[in-house]
Amino acid sequence: MDIEAEPSLRSIVNHESLKWIFVGGKGGVGKTTTSSSISIQLALHNPNKKYLLISTDPAHNLSDAFNQKFGKDARQVEGLPNLSCMEIDPDSTLENLQKNNESTFGSAGGNDPLKSMMGDITGSIPGIDEAFSFMEVLKHIGETKENQIKYDTVIFDTAPTGHTLRFLQLPSTLEKLLGKVNELSGRFGPMLNNLLGSQGGQSIDFASKIKEIQVQVTEVNKQFQDPELTTFVCVCISEFLSLYETERLIQELMSYNMDVNSIVINQLLFSDDSECRRCNARWRMQKKYLDQMDELYEDYHLVKMPLLAMEVRGLENLKKFSKYLIEPYNSETDGHVVFDLEEQ
């Protein structure tokens, strides 16, 4: 690119059509703070739109970040009416599915072949927990009875990099899986319906149900590869391992044809004239990797965020911090923010 990319996420906040925003990176680099900050800026700049921030990280830090309890159902952020949050628990989602299977298939004791078959399926597919978490997400962003979309944009606070990549494979994985199940249901669906009926279960049209899910997943897969609808924001710190992980993540995202052109670099010291020798040494180390990133990602939006004296917790503190995603931080004029946050 001939024009240097602005060192902010303003293009994301002002984007009119984005429906999916993923935020991910190595563990411990500030993904939750960044995803929360992006969500807040979106909500503040676009008050007529509705946003949903979802944690797919088993650690679930959204409740801690906002100082408000969130769970598996979307809940509005107190003080920000057009932003809601939810925390998806993959293990819990899978357990609920298995319980639903029991109620649907009935119970014929420990040797029930249908229960055994479902157990084998749910236990043998890699990433099955993320798969059903993803289906849970689709339920929450669907249309209401009045045919109005519940949320304009969904922001994902993802698990550490490996889990993120597995989550992003889900649309194509589910598409292949559902195609196979659809094939089997055509051969065995009537037999299963009869068997379920004889066990007291409800008759189910397997083929139509699978087709319904398959259409939905195929559509989402297309949206993930459309830069007008989906983008990924990488989060890192200025250290070797984090830089290496970020490059690996970007290459993987490109292989999925997913748009990625923004990197948030957290925990920067911005100082080499302090009396703190340790701080100066660390800044010199950070500066070395920052220079590498400036060269390697010259056409990316590189957003450089300061290391603060306190944790960024609570809506008001997140608002203060998040504005530097839009207005680039200047250590000479904005240095006070490092100590300005209120203790939570």
UniProtKB/Swiss-Prot annotation:
Q: Which residues form the active site?
A: D57
- Extract the GO molecular function terms from the UniProt entry: ATP binding; ATP hydrolysis activity; metal ion binding
For this protein, the Enzyme Commission number is 3.6.-.-
Binding positions for Zn(2+) per the UniProt entry = C276, C279
Q: Which Gene3D superfamilies match?
A: P-loop containing nucleotide triphosphate hydrolases
Q: Name one Pfam family in it.
A: ArsA_ATPase
For the ligand (ATP), the binding residues are K26, G27, G28, V29, G30, K31, T32, T33, E239, N266
CDD domains according to UniProt: ArsA
Q: Where in the cell is it found?
A: Cytoplasm; Endoplasmic reticulum; Golgi apparatus
Top-level taxon in the UniProt lineage: Eukaryota
Q: Which GO terms describe its biological process?
A: tail-anchored membrane protein insertion into ER membrane
Q: Which UniProt keywords are given for this protein, alphabetically ordered?
A: ATP-binding, Cytoplasm, Endoplasmic reticulum, Golgi apparatus, Hydrolase, Metal-binding, Nucleotide-binding, Transport, Zinc
Could you name the Gene Ontology cellular component terms for this entry? GET complex; Golgi apparatus
Q: Which family is this protein grouped under?
A: Belongs to the arsA ATPase family.
- PANTHER family of this UniProt entry? ARSENICAL PUMP-DRIVING ATPASE ARSENITE-TRANSLOCATING ATPASE (PTHR10803), ATPASE GET3 (PTHR10803:SF3)
- Known function: ATPase required for the post-translational delivery of tail-anchored (TA) proteins to the endoplasmic reticulum. Recognizes and selectively binds the transmembrane domain of TA proteins in the cytosol. This complex then targets to the endoplasmic reticulum by membrane-bound receptors GET1 and GET2, where the tail-anchored protein is released for insertion. This process is regulated by ATP binding and hydrolysis. ATP binding drives the homodimer towards the closed dimer state, facilitating recognition of newly synthesized TA membrane proteins. ATP hydrolysis is required for insertion.
Question: How is the quaternary structure described?
Answer: Homodimer. Component of the Golgi to ER traffic (GET) complex, which is composed of GET1, GET2 and GET3. Within the complex, GET1 and GET2 form a heterotetramer which is stabilized by phosphatidylinositol binding and which binds to the GET3 homodimer. Interacts with the chloride channel protein GEF1.
Name of protein: ATPase GET3
Q: Which organism is this entry from?
A: Komagataella phaffii (strain GS115 / ATCC 20864)
This chain is encoded by the gene named GET3
